[in-house]
A protein has these predicted regions:
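Outer-membrane beta-barrel transmembrane strand signature
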Residues: 1-8, 68-72, 77-79, 90-93, ...
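Solvent-exposed loop/turn elements at secondary-structure boundaries
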Residues: 118, 184-254, 271-308
Length: 442
């Protein structure tokens, strides 16, 4: 993989300024050829005189068992794979301190081009190109007050020209209280106290299926299937099928996140980190599954319609202690609690409130409520009809489902949220380590 990198220090012009440029070309090729044979298997038997004779068990004759043996090596090729990637970036960095002030800035521009030699379809066989510009600007006063601004200005080939570029800024502030002069009297007990807050945006262009690479272009198959004409359909012609309709409005999936954090150190051995966050994802790509068939559409319709929220807290507790020159103890515990909720969902106006998924967890399961088992066939005949013909498709001893809407039959109208979300809301992890000069106990 050839790579070129150039570093230039520009302190002579502007103190603290430096430039870096790097580019590389990576090519990957793989193929496999195998030569093998199928062995013959023999069975030994003795005649009346005690002489042994061998008989081939898999020679392909009548009564042969297993894979037929071969006397030669066959030749087999696997699928070949060829990929290439071109990558380049340029970085301008500035760091300068004057008095108690420290300022920093970094700007990065990058381009990337990748190509697959055996993509499998037309759209994936085209070169994949992305560009991006990102930056970071920071200010630090006496290691007490810290402000930071980050941004990403990225371009994606997947969207139309007016939707292609996305700007995603992020702001952050932190206050290191333990570095204040008034904090000195309690530093032996509270060795560290820092609060921080961030608020920012992020974008995701890896949405939908890989086959739907260019949402703003129609995908038309000019040779979908053959249709016959004439006597006995003896004359055939290829037909045209639409696999995707062009959509100029599909764009980046966006997320907005706010974080509040606390860093607390006690006795220089114990450290507690607490982070509380809230994230809202919008423009989530979703299939429009509730479009009437009378519109005559042949391909599925997708749009940036859905919206979801997640929030939670992350807690980390670390303990590090040295006993003398040889003993050492370390402990770490983490706890995460997170919940999610659907805010906007592409669904029709139901009469039954229980059918809506808005307000439920992103991993909430929906289904039928199983009340109990039918006592006997008589109860089957006197209960709401469910999934077939009573007394024939289900009998006494089968599961009895609840008629939620009371219409006398079990249908999709009776599906409700059941059980807990499939994604755990709480997780914990604990580790410890005790080390002596000769032993390590975990």
């Amino acid at each position: 993989m050839p790579q070129i990198q150039i570093n230039q220090n520009l302190n002579a012009l502007i103190p603290g300024l430096s430039l870096t440029a790097m580019t590389y070309l990576k090519r990957y090729a793989y193929f496999e050829v195998s030569r093998k044979y199928n062995p013959f298997y023999y069975t030994a038997s003795a005649d009346a005189t005690g002489d042994l004779s061998l008989r081939v068990m898999n020679d392909g004759s009548l009564g042969s068992i297993g894979t037929v043996g071969t006397e030669y090596l066959d030749y087999s090729e696997s699928a070949k794979e060829v990929n290439s990637m071109f990558y380049a970036h340029a970085i301008a960095s500035y760091n300068h301190a004057f008095g108690k002030h420290n300022v920093g800035a970094t700007v990065i521009g990058l381009v990337q081009n990748s190509l697959s030699g055996n993509a499998g379809n037309l759209q994936l066989s085209l070169p994949s190109r992305n560009i991006g510009l990102s930056g970071r600007f920071s200010y630090n006063f006496d290691d007490r007050y810290i402000a930071e601004f980050n941004f990403g200005y990225n371009g994606s080939e997947r969207f139309a020209k007016n939707r292609r570029l996305g700007f995603f800024p992020c702001f952050g502030l932190s206050y290191n209280i333990s570095n204040e002069s008034f904090f000195e009297p309690v530093k032996d007990v509270i060795s560290k106290l820092k609060i921080r807050a961030t608020h920012g945006f992020a974008g995701n262009d890896q949405i939908g299926r890989s086959q739907d690479r260019f949402f703003y272009l129609s995908d038309v198959d000019m040779n979908a299937f053959q249709i016959g004409f004439g006597e006995l359909s003896g004359y055939t012609r290829p037909t045209i099928a639409i696999r995707r309709y062009a959509n100029q409005d599909i764009t980046w999936e966006r997320s907005r996140q706010t974080n509040l954090g606390l860093e607390l150190g006690l006795f220089k051995d114990l450290e507690l980190n607490v982070d509380v966050y809230k994230q809202i994802r919008s423009n989530i790509l979703t299939g429009r599954s509730y479009i009437p068939s009378t519109m005559g559409l042949r391909a599925a319709i997708v749009a940036n319609t859905n919206k979801a929220e997640s929030k939670g807290v992350d807690v980390t507790l670390n303990y590090n202690k040295n006993f003398g020159d040889s003993w050492y103890i370390q402990g770490r515990g983490t706890m995460t609690y997170a919940v999610s909720k659907k805010l906007i969902v592409d669904e029709p106006a139901y009469k039954e409130a229980s059918r809506y998924t808005v307000g439920t967890s992103a991993s909430q399961e929906f289904g039928y409520i199983a009340e109990r088992l039918f006592v006997d066939d008589q109860e089957v005949l006197n209960s709401p009809v469910q999934f077939g013909k009573p007394g024939l498709d289900y009998l006494g001893g089968d599961i009895k489902y609840r008629d939620v809407n009371g219409d006398g039959q079990i249908t999709d109208l009776d599906r409700v949220a059941i059980g807990y979300p499939t994604t755990p809301e709480r997780s914990e992890e604990h580790t410890s380590e005790l080390q002596s000069p000769d032993h390590l106990v975990c």
